[in-house]
Amino acid sequence: MTEVNINVTEIMEALPHRYPFLLVDRVIDIADDEITAIKNVTINEEFFQGHFPQYPVMPGVLIMEALAQAAGVLELSKPENKGKLVFYAGMDNVKYKKQVTPGDQLVLHAKFIKRRGPIAVVEAEATVDGKLAAKGTLTFALGK
């Protein structure tokens, strides 16, 4: 992979997501079929208002969404995919291993392992301080 520093402004050029649903802050490594990105988790996240006010924990499904968005940055940054959308088509073998709380920095790693036409399969994992927080296999459909 190639070490890069893609900031949120550049991420927003690839992804259609916006606040409060943009869950990727920076890309730090990228290759043809692999990406590593960062999500800085703060108490200001809207989901913490209800999940849970006395014990804020990032919902696991949003960790998977952050991983999906990281993979989306990679796919939508390719010139042939400019202006297209990536749709979440499924999750398999998802495991949540560590609670993610305000102040954590999620390191998001996604690797495309299979493609067939507009469908792609990605192995993804999120870590905090080098410890696995979540992992799973994500399926995407590229469309307009």
UniProtKB/Swiss-Prot annotation:
Predominant place of localization: cytoplasm
Gene Ontology terms describing biological process: fatty acid biosynthetic process; lipid A biosynthetic process
Record: active site: H51
NCBIfam families named among the record's database cross-references: fabZ, PRK00006.1
Entries under HAMAP family matching the protein: FabZ
Recorded family membership: Belongs to the thioester dehydratase family. FabZ subfamily.
Protein name, UniProt field: 3-hydroxyacyl-[acyl-carrier-protein] dehydratase FabZ
Lineage: Bacteria, Bacillati, Bacillota, Bacilli, Lactobacillales
